[in-house]
């Protein structure tokens, strides 16, 4: 009879140390993927903005590049 309470206490102590569930890992992966996609979109927007500025400067200097 003494083993049952000890077993329950050990079970309660071990449960928070359980590994993450599959759903939690998938959610973390999706969050990381979303952040990566956001970074890529920002870089593309930044590069296209630079190309637009370079094009407008080129058109002001020489009309053959427009």
Swiss-Prot record:
Family: Belongs to the conotoxin T superfamily.
Residue numbers covered by the propeptide annotation in the UniProt entry: 20-54
Record remark on domains: The cysteine framework is V (CC-CC).
Organism placement in taxonomy: Eukaryota, Metazoa, Spiralia, Lophotrochozoa, Mollusca
Record-given protein name: Conotoxin Lt5.6
Primary residence: secreted
Residues in the signal sequence: 1-19
Organism of provenance: Conus litteratus (Lettered cone)
Residues in coiled coil: none
Annotated keywords: Disulfide bond, Secreted, Signal, Toxin
Subcellular location: Secreted
